[in-house]
Every structure is written in structure tokens, then in C-alpha cells.
Amino acid sequence: EEKELEFFQTSESSSSTFCKINYNSKYFKRKKKILSFFNKNEYIVKSELIKLKTLENEFTRLNLKYADILKIDTEGFEFDVIKGARNKLKYIKFILFEHHYDQMIIKNYKFGQINDYLTQLNFKRIIKFKMPFRKTFEYIYINKELE
């Protein structure tokens, strides 16, 4: 089933997201101050409805049997992407994703929920890396069935 969701295009595309922005967060205020030297536009430039596709459906459509690595960088929408893979996760060896702890992106989940979900599906966290200058970490999980 395809559904539509509002996508927010930011003035600097690396932060475009399906999630709402917390304009009162300390991180947003600091980021906006720095970006204002280069870009005088509003932070959210436009929004539009986007048809979502799930990884489960794309695996089927493309007739994929497995994936060595799934890299997810969706600015607060990572858990939705992972859940959208459903029963195809068992065919993915590594999952790499980032998680923001800075409160700028309003997410509908916490990191512990992703960790619990992947752990229940036989994934194990093998790497946690803090990104410089912000409260964001990258995580790599391995599928223990495919180790």
C-alpha cells in the first residue's frame, strides 16, 4: 500500500525531512545562525506530498534476493524506513543509519525503539560513531544470521 506524506525541503538540502522541525531547539538556533552567513532564505523552502514506497515492496519489485548493506540517512525517518523493510530485513547483512539526539527534528520514536526492534530481528549493534559538532551518532548493525 502506498501512502503520501508531507516532505519538507530545507534551504540546505542535507536536512530536508519528512519530520517537523523544532524551531526552539538549541541546535536549530545555532545551525540557523551559522547558515545565515551563507543563506538568507527561510529554513523550510517548500513542502510537498510525496508517495512513499517501502523497502519490502522495492525488494519485491526489483526481484532482490539480498543486500549487503542498507544505508539510511533520512533525517529522523530512519525507523519508518527500517519498519518498511518488514520481512526483507532478514536478507540484509548490515544496516547503517544515523540517529539525531539534538531535538531539532521531531521524531515519533526514540533510539531504544530502533535498537529493540533490530535486536528482536536478530541484529547486533557492532559500531557506534559520534559525528563531529552535533548530537548525532551513526550506528552499524549486523544480521547475526548472515555473519
Question: What does each model-identified segment do?
Answer:
Residues 1-147:
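Phosphate/nucleotide-binding beta-alpha loop and adjacent structural elements of enzyme active sites
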